[in-house]
Amino acid sequence: MAPSDDLVYMAKLAEQAERYDEMVEAMNSVAKLDEGLTKEERNLLSVGYKNLIGAKRAAMRIIGSIELKEETKGKESHVRQTAEYRRKVEAEMDKICCDVINIIDKYLIPHSSGAESSVFYYKMKGDYYRYLAEFKTGTEKIEVSELSLNAYETASKTAQTDLTPTDPIRLGLALNISVFYCEIMNSPDKACQLAKNAFDEAVAELPSLSEENYKDSTLIMQLLRDNLALWNSDMADDADDIRERTDTTGAKGDPAA
């Protein structure tokens, strides 16, 4: 039995028990064997980290909302306590993101074989820098945003040339890059453009979509379409607000009135 077999089994066991810290620990040990990861193994690693960071991101959203409410109430002691708690969760997020990025850079990218695994790892790297950008500020936010974009662009170059438009990894990459542009770069126009291009290209190739990828690919396509609808609606609302303000300002300032 290969050394990785016991570790992979433990990772699967930990996943079933929803003990994601132990799942990640087991899969990190597999990565450090320097043998590269199989498709199943890299998915296990991704699922473990996704659940770990997902819980922290959800906590951050809740804490951020509470912090705003306390600021509105003007309760300084509560604001201070909430801010301290937020910083605690930020530190935990920082560690998770830095750990996975280190594993990717040190063990996974150097041992990736083929376009699929390369795109997977660079996409994952972009994702975790994006999660850092969600709470970093100032120059730190700029730095991690640039690192996220660099990783996404590296993944995208390979995906465009070596993966089909309906490949779930390529579609997932397009989905996450578009989210990056909307939420981190505050560029919904660019986000919509990327999401629409990915969706349209995939639709054109649907007849050749393999049965193996059908479920995953169509699910991501639906997410792309949902995001497009949401972002276009938000931009339309913003445009209406701007027109209303312009009309009001114009009427007040028009010398011919």
UniProtKB/Swiss-Prot annotation:
Annotated signal sequence range: none
Organism, scientific name: Oryza sativa subsp. japonica
Gene Ontology process terms (BP): protein localization; signal transduction
Protein name, as recorded: 14-3-3-like protein GF14-G
SUPFAM superfamilies xrefs: 14-3-3 protein
PANTHER family, per database record: 14-3-3 PROTEIN (PTHR18860)
Classification via Pfam families: 14-3-3
Gene: GF14G
Free-text function comment from the UniProt entry: Is associated with a DNA binding complex that binds to the G box, a well-characterized cis-acting DNA regulatory element found in plant genes.
Protein family: Belongs to the 14-3-3 family.
Gene Ontology CC entries for this record: cytoplasm
Highest rank taxon of the organism: Eukaryota
